[in-house]
A protein has these predicted regions:
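Class I S-adenosyl-L-methionine-dependent methyltransferase catalytic core
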Residues: 1-186
């Protein structure tokens, strides 16, 4: 999504094309998700209010923080200090929201919210998040929107996901959405 601070070298627009909140809210997410499903939504703290708006626009209800990515420097030593007007951002939350009444597939009761992982290319998320989602929810159908890269076992959509030839901004329609999980990287 678009931030108001476009002049910064770290601005998303300097790394990839972005969409407005209005356009993201208008995506036909209902066409690619089951009536009863779970959403894992990455956001940043300056965009937390917009993330809640997006959750509601897509027909989901906020439940909890799924993960808190504590960003390490690229070499893995010391904490990464990102941008920030008040404090320097070095964590990124992944929210959990639900649509309908999804089965609680919880496979493990030992999943920690904390993910410590070095930063990667802009907006790329730690692979451990996908692993934790599968450990938590089981190996059920799942799709990742705005994927920066493909991942085994995940349907991916986005103008940078290598396994897709689907043009942005309209995501693919899925035939079988039973038990669908969604992980959105915005």
């Amino acid at each position: 999504w678009r931030y108001s601070d476009k002049g910064s070298a770290g601005a998303a627009e300097n790394h990839y094309s972005t969409m407005s909140i209005k356009d993201i809210c208008a995506l036909p997410v209902a066409d690619i998700t089951a009536d009863d499903c779970v959403l894992f939504l990455w956001t940043t703290y300056p965009m937390l209010q917009e993330a809640m708006t997006l959750i509601a626009a897509w027909g989901f209800k906020y439940k909890s923080i799924g993960f808190q990515w504590l960003k390490l420097n690229r070499g893995g030593k010391g904490y990464f200090f990102g941008l920030g007007r008040w404090t320097r951002g070095n964590t990124e939350p992944c929210l959990i929201a639900i649509k309908g009444k999804p089965c609680r597939y919880v496979q493990s009761q030992s999943i920690s919210q904390i993910i410590e992982h070095p930063v990667m290319r802009h907006s790329a998320k730690p692979p451990l998040a996908r692993e934790k989602i599968i450990e938590l929810m089981g190996d059920i159908p799942r799709i990742e929107l705005f994927a920066r890269e493909g991942a085994a076992g995940w349907d991916c959509w986005g103008n940078e996901a290598p396994e897709t030839n689907i043009p942005a901004p309209e995501p693919p329609k899925r035939k079988d959405t039973s038990g669908q999980l969604s992980l959105f990287e915005i």
